[in-house]
Amino acid sequence: PEATERLIELAEQIKGQKTADGKAIKNEEWRTRTLSERLNFALIKGNTEYLEADLAEALTVYASPVEIIEGPLMQGMDKVGTLFGEGKMFLPQVVKSAKAMKAAVAILQPEIEKHNAGTGENIQRPKVVLATAKGDVHDIGKNIVSIVLTCNNFDVIDLGVMVDNQKIVAAAKAHQADLIGVSGLITPSLSEMEALCELLQKEQLRIPLIVGGATTSTVHTAVKLAPRYDYGVIQGGDASRTAGIMKRLLSDRSSYLAQVKAEQEKIRGQYYHKQDRLLPYTEAQALAPVFDRESYRLPASFGEHNLLGKNMDLQDLIAKIDWTPFFHFWGFKGKFPEIIHQHEEADRTYQAALEMLGTVIAGNEFEASIVVNFFDAYAEDDEIVLDNGHRLPMLRQQKAGQECLSLSDYICPKAYGTSTIGLFALKVADKQGGCDCHDFSHLLRESLCARLTEALAEWMQEQLSEGLSLIRPAFGYSACPDHSLKKDVFDLLDAPSKIGVSLTTSYAIYPTTSLCGMLIAHPAARYFSIGKIGADQLTDYCTKRAITLEEEKRLLGL
């Protein structure tokens, strides 16, 4: 242990010194260490330069290639997992470590096959099946979990995105999985997770299920998922926490699940005891804010021209990038720019991002496209009615004590005439395909696409605001949680043919780094959360949408 600590300390001390002509000086002191320490160091630092030579030497020292993997290589990866869990290593470093481990195994693979053929031995690692729920195309979080699990000595079977529940169960059986992990970003994924729990219960697989993604929560897991499956359903949280949960399930399943189930029982009790008091829908409508007629008057220039932009210049977006969420994605806590002065690895990641931006701009490797159409519109019975007759129903806050807001409040009431509303769809897509989704460069590109998408939305708002108070609520988010409205807007804008975006059966947008929503101008316009709604409003909304109650519950995650 003391030698390993010295090695970690040495790794942290290497600062990339430079000569007078600006060239980096290689610090090769670690090459004087023992073979085991050198292999540990290579994995911790993600350094593959000497792997072939060191592994060739290891084959002459260790009895078998299996011993090399289970010895110095896994010792290094165990340390990576520990340091990441303690917040002493960050995701960029973990990704590079995982890549180095993959390279080491690839180098040893021919010898492993020879050894296995002669002895019948195999390396046994705990197996976890990972998948993104059916209808959901967001996989970046799942890919990060996969990387972290690999660093924690798991054998990961990644089924990809939009995976049917039957396929998940079949894979768990075929691979004799120890654990199953399912992620989802959009609310319809919650109903898929509920159905998966019921299927697992029916099949009696007795394999714990870990769920994750932005749409999941400890409350939903306790109230809607856990009662459907007797053998453990846990909400994972971030990659580090998910890895910790899975390790606990392997080492101490019975007592850990008993603890989790007791906590979930408590959460269910609190949930049912503290049911929010909801106003009757008609009363919530009566309490809607009232604005004077003049507040809906907009300059004639607002919405005068529609906007269609293809292959836009990314240079226009760089200044509008919000870097703080970028660093949060990579596991750094704090705000930009202070964060790059607080963490050396954050600064390295930032420099890599800037270099990558330069590369993709020079090579025209990202496509930024946008379509915005404006419509005269009025509000009637919580619906936004466009000048072509199309109606977009909006939900209204119904919880007692809330302001009973609806986005339709910011649109001119029919009695006053009309105001102008914009509908938009936009994307920033990576033209480069066929990349290793676990590679640092790929994750960096994907995280930059996400930031540039938000920057494009910011640019759009700035270009079109005419100095007005303007909001851009996106469908599927808290003020307008119905994802199916994206289909209405895609049809109204002809977005698929104009900018090359599409929808899944659960209304997730592809490419994933895309947005769809409304542009609403009003002095009082602001973002808010609808929260819980009553059966009366839900029934009314289903009638307006001409959709079944069951389907709307799925869309809203109810």
What are the residue ranges of the model-derived segments?
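Short acidic-hydrophobic, aromatic-tinged amphipathic segments that line or gate anion-handling sites
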Residues: 232-238
